[in-house]
Amino acid sequence: MMGQSFFYSMPRTLCNSQGPCTILAGRVGVVFADGKEANPSTGIYIHHILTSDSTKKQKPWLSNCGNSNTPALNIAGLLGGTAFVGTGEDSAERGTVYTSEDGTRNSGYHVGAQDTFTGWAQLVNYNKEAKKIYVFYDLEWIPGIVGDDVKTATFTATCGGSPMIKLSTTGPTNTTSGKFHFLEDGNILGARGHLHGMIFSFLSVTHNRLTGFQ
């Protein structure tokens, strides 16, 4: 098993190559050179793929947990700018929607003509041989700036490491975060979780020892 983390930049290569655009929905994933989607059944595991519009700046709308005056730690925002579509293997089936599910809400993710996107992918290859894969973006969009610009946030429910996630060898356990506070009025269009902090052991096929992976 081999894991790899890499960063990439996409200057005006999504929907804004001909001018500004509005994205209604999107999904990100990885494929092989023949176009077949790479997933655990083919030996490729996505720990996460994060994307950020590095040019776009938004005022935070959600607080950090346990502190109503401090903005939430924006994980994708670590790339700079505003969070865009992302995925983890436990949340890869459905993408992100920037309007209502039926598409009637007049809103979307606004992208300027000069906006540049940055991506951060962490992948694991369970195959014995190296594999060449490609990151893909499947977007539903319309030309121009249309409707309300949605706001996004990618944050940690453990407030950046405190409280620690509770673990148990005897059965289920719960970890409760501090309270999050909304910093402005609005409507939530969607949300999904992504598990972090899981540590497991496996038998190394080359060194006959137990190895930890996070």
Q: What is the meaning of each model-derived region?
A:
Residues 1-214:
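Beta-strand-centric surfaces of beta-sandwich/beta-rich domains
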